């Protein structure tokens, strides 16, 4: 699986066991990503932070 880094078009190949791409954004500024990368379990969103997870190459 390949996931985008914080600044596309840079990306990285995920290590074994981390099979989700994720994007973390602040709810007040949803268009500005704070973090991107590979993750094993999609975290729960909170009042301030929203997580978007997906399973396709470079989908974050």
UniProtKB/Swiss-Prot annotation:
- Extract the SUPFAM superfamilies matched here: Snake toxin-like (SSF57302)
Q: Which cysteines are joined by disulfide bonds?
A: 3-21, 14-38, 42-53, 54-59
Major subcellular site: secreted
Molecular-function GO term, any one: toxin activity
Do you know which Pfam families this protein is assigned to?
Toxin_cobra-type
Question: Where found in the cell?
Answer: Secreted; Target cell membrane
Record CDD domains: TFP_snake_toxin
Choose any GO biological process term that the UniProt entry carries and state it. killing of cells of another organism
Keyword terms, alphabetized: Cardiotoxin, Cytolysis, Disulfide bond, Hemolysis, Membrane, Secreted, Target cell membrane, Target membrane, Toxin
Q: Which InterPro entries match?
A: Cytotoxin_Cobra (IPR003572), Snake_3FTx (IPR003571), Snake_toxin-like_sf (IPR045860), Snake_toxin_con_site (IPR018354), Toxin_cobra-type (IPR054131)
Tissues expressing this chain? Expressed by the venom gland.
Would you tell me the Gene Ontology cellular component terms? Answer: extracellular region; membrane; other organism cell membrane
Answer whether the UniProt record assigns the keyword Cell division to this protein: no
Q: What quaternary structure, including any partners, is listed in this protein's UniProt entry?
A: Monomer in solution; Homodimer and oligomer in the presence of negatively charged lipids forming a pore with a size ranging between 20 and 30 angstroms.
Q: What does this protein do?
A: Basic protein that binds to cell membrane and depolarizes cardiomyocytes. This cytotoxin also possesses lytic activity on many other cells, including red blood cells. Interaction with sulfatides in the cell membrane induces pore formation and cell internalization and is responsible for cytotoxicity in cardiomyocytes. It targets the mitochondrial membrane and induces mitochondrial swelling and fragmentation. Inhibits protein kinases C. It binds to the integrin alpha-V/beta-3 with a moderate affinity.
Q: Which family does it belong to?
A: Belongs to the three-finger toxin family. Short-chain subfamily. Type IA cytotoxin sub-subfamily.
- Reproduce the miscellaneous comment text: Positive charges of Lys residues are necessary for cytolytic activity of this toxin, but not for its binding ability.
- Put simply, this protein is called Naniproin
